[in-house]
């Protein structure tokens, strides 16, 4: 018999959906039924989500100064609130947990108005706009990189780390094996769940600048946006090298486990996953992030020695080629970085977050939860 329904709310990108998925698996192990509320974008990432049902609720962000656009967004939010209220009244969840992104706002607001226990999980080192809007209303705030007892809501905040999917936990069992001169070198390049156009343009040029001996060693996995597939595929064909390119890899965990180096953005889920697996990385924060959250996430891992951070404005093809030349000839350095990254990982984050969910659902306070963890 189920202990009750937990309703998870997540924005429709991998950065929000993946940690929610990891928690969902853990809650199901503990005897709960899990439902997910999100937007239509999440269908791409929710294929393995262990939910009894996935609900799409209307939502919108108010980012325009156009009065017509603002009015349309407010109408959509109001519609989402009504739909979320009906959903919560029907499901009667024991708790509603938000993972950030504007689609979480209607269900979390509806839950607080109905008196249902609520909490949010903030993946980044800087709190996002949706979570900021909800933080004063919820009973607890779990943080991936937020400092425990710090920030604007110290009495509510518990540092759990970012939960990672079972596939990542399995990949973490694979030890890092360095690639020595003359051996194949697995390079994984991606820009988060939605890709990064900059890498699609810069990497092929960088590879063309490498010595033939190094280029022949490379085995590349690169996530490429659909509109860039033809361009990148043509460059790869000209270079006559081994490369897998695709808009999305369902087996990314296994590919990361085989990687000798990762070049990627520094979204919270990405940084958490590569640290749990323990792989050296060159992190390139997304330069247009509103709160510079990716720069803060990257700095946290770089401080441990597990990653090198380079601003996109400084990452020319020549710079990439120089980095690859250096590290492909220095397997010992990459091994040290891999070990440092793994030490920074929090593989038990899903369990810690599930403990917090159960505590709040049972009516316990954050202060009580912290005392039991001490």
Swiss-Prot record:
Q: Name one GO molecular function term.
A: UDP-N-acetyl-D-glucosamine:N-acetylmuramoyl-L-alanyl-D-glutamyl-meso-2,6-diaminopimelyl-D-alanyl-D-alanine-diphosphoundecaprenol 4-beta-N-acetylglucosaminlytransferase activity
EC class name? transferase
> Which pathway is it part of?
Cell wall biogenesis; peptidoglycan biosynthesis
Gene Ontology cellular-component annotations: plasma membrane
The keyword Membrane is annotated on this UniProt entry = yes
Q: Which domain of life is it from?
A: Bacteria
Q: What is the reaction catalyzed?
A: di-trans,octa-cis-undecaprenyl diphospho-N-acetyl-alpha-D-muramoyl-L-alanyl-D-glutamyl-meso-2,6-diaminopimeloyl-D-alanyl-D-alanine + UDP-N-acetyl-alpha-D-glucosamine = di-trans,octa-cis-undecaprenyl diphospho-[N-acetyl-alpha-D-glucosaminyl-(1->4)]-N-acetyl-alpha-D-muramoyl-L-alanyl-D-glutamyl-meso-2,6-diaminopimeloyl-D-alanyl-D-alanine + UDP + H(+)
Q: What EC number(s) does this enzyme carry? A: 2.4.1.227
Q: Where does UDP-N-acetyl-alpha-D-glucosamine bind?
A: 13-15, 124, 165, 193, 294
What Gene Ontology biological process does one annotation of this record name?
cell division
* InterPro entries found in the cross-reference section: GlcNAc_MurG, Glyco_trans_28_C, GlycoTrans_28_N
The entry's function note states:
Cell wall formation. Catalyzes the transfer of a GlcNAc subunit on undecaprenyl-pyrophosphoryl-MurNAc-pentapeptide (lipid intermediate I) to form undecaprenyl-pyrophosphoryl-MurNAc-(pentapeptide)GlcNAc (lipid intermediate II).
Family of the protein in this entry:
Belongs to the glycosyltransferase 28 family. MurG subfamily.
Output this protein's name.
UDP-N-acetylglucosamine--N-acetylmuramyl-(pentapeptide) pyrophosphoryl-undecaprenol N-acetylglucosamine transferase
Q: Which organism is it from?
A: Rhizobium leguminosarum bv. trifolii (strain WSM2304)
Name of the coding gene: murG
């Amino acid at each position: 018999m189920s202990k009750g329904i937990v309703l998870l709310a997540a924005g429709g990108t991998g950065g929000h959906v993946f940690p929610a998925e990891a928690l969902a698996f853990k809650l199901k192990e503990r005897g709960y039924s899990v439902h997910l509320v999100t937007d239509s974008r999440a269908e791409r990432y929710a294929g393995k989500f262990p939910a009894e049902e996935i609900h799409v609720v209307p939502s919108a962000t108010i980012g325009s100064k156009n009065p017509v656009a603002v009015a349309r967004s407010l109408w959509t939010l109001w519609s989402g609130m009504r739909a979320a209220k009906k959903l919560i009244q029907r499901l009667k969840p024991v708790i509603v947990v938000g993972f950030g992104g504007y689609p979480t706002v209607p269900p979390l607001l509806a839950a607080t108005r109905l008196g249902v226990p609520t909490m949010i999980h903030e993946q980044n080192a800087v709190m996002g706009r949706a979570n900021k809007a909800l933080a004063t209303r919820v009973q607890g705030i779990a943080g991936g990189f937020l400092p425990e007892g710090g920030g604007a809501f110290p009495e509510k905040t518990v540092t759990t780390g970012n939960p990672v999917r079972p596939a990542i936990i399995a990949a973490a069992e694979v030890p890092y094996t360095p690639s020595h001169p003359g051996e194949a070198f697995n390079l994984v390049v991606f820009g988060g769940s939605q890709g990064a156009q900059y890498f699609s343009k810069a990497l092929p040029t960088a590879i063309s600048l490498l010595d033939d001996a190094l280029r022949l060693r490379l085995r590349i996995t690169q996530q490429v946006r659909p509109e860039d597939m033809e361009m990148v595929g043509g460059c790869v064909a000209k270079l006559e090298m081994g490369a897998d390119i695709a808009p999305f890899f369902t087996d990314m965990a296994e590919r990361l486990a085989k990687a000798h180096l990762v070049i990627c953005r520094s979204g919270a889920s990405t940084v958490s996953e590569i640290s749990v697996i323990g792989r050296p990385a060159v992190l390139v924060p997304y330069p247009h992030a509103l709160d510079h959250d990716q720069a803060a996430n990257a700095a946290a891992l770089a401080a441990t020695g597990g990653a090198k951070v380079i601003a996109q404005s400084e990452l020319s093809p020549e710079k990439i080629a120089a980095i690859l030349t250096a590290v492909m000839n220095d397997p010992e350095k990459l091994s040290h970085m891999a070990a440092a990254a793994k030490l920074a990982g929090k593989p038990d984050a899903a369990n810690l977050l599930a403990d917090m969910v159960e505590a709040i659902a049972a009516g316990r306070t954050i202060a009580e939860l912290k005392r039991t963890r001490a």
